[in-house]
Amino acid sequence: VARRMSVSEFLPTASGADRTAPQAAAQPNRVSGGLVDRARTIAFTFDGKRYHGHPGDTLASALMANDVALLGRSFKYHRPRGLIAAGSEEPNALVTLGQGVDQTPNTRATMVELAAGLSAHSQNRWPSLRFDALAVNDLLAPVLSAGFYYKTFMWPAAFWEKLYEPLIRRAAGLGRLATSATADISDRGDLHCDVLVVGAGPAGLMAALTAGRAGVRVILADEDFAPGGRLNAEWAVIDDAPATGWVRAALAELASLRNVRVMARTTVFGAFDHGTYGALELAAPGGPPDAPRQTFWRVQARACVLCAGATERPIAFS
């Protein structure tokens, strides 16, 4: 099942990017640097409104550049919420991708690779994100404390099944699942290696390089579409050169080693008995229509190196 991959597959490819489209006229928060290719423009929509971003953007970074700060509503009181993180730890910017049978709810905008024609919608609001009628819950906060439904809706008993429970169920949850079967294809497979490296930041890249140079079979898995971890977002210097250059060189060497497989867009979600690990790989945007949209891998590894990094807790929650 394995195939050879080049370093270009882990860098912004501008799949579906419009080279002739004008640059976004008003992106007050657009900053320089990073892996964003500002020479090419991608059109996408959020809640039906058209915006522009660039190859290398995530949905979150493109919305931020376009001065879109409100991305969601809190679960219970429907208070306005924006970004507080940049990766899979983001709790607020949960969106629905696509429409109809192809829609995917509860997707973190910080993990969505921007692609031409991307359609995203906010969740947990009615009738719109900016004017959410259920924000009235915030005014009722004193009587909607934790576990209020176990005390408030006890009488009359006949109302529970017919009235109270349907109302609570409608208010609960965030995104909505598609009600019909999708035409998208999912697949599964098995992989075997000597060393599984989880995370392709600086530590993960070095671990994969060290093991790969030793001649053992290596799988390097990273949840992001651009391996490099924090080096992609910092002005770091390695060996008197920008860290992004070191990442490119490391990926190029790994791609040249036949005993190494680099898997971007792949989340290792569990470690099980006898060296078995579960991983979910997502397809890159713009791939063949008959290709699997996602693949579940069962990985058998003799050893695992966990290089998942760390996430600082925001001071507001310390």
What are these regions (language model features)?
Residues 3-174, 182, 191, 295:
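Signature of N-terminal electron-transfer/Fe-S-associated modules in redox systems
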Residues 97, 222, 279-281:
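Residue-level signal for short segments within beta-strands and strand-turn junctions
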Residues 58-59, 203, 267:
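Residue-level recognition of oxygen-bearing side chains
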Residues 79-82, 122-198, 244-318:
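FAD-binding core/adjacent interface of flavoenzyme oxidoreductases
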Residues 193-254, 315-317:
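Beta1-alpha1 glycine-rich phosphate/pyrophosphate-binding loop at the start
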Residues 38-41, 54, 89-92, 191-192, ...:
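Short coil/turn connectors at secondary-structure junctions
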Residues 53, 72-73, 77, 220-222, ...:
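General beta-strand structural signal in soluble alpha/beta enzymes
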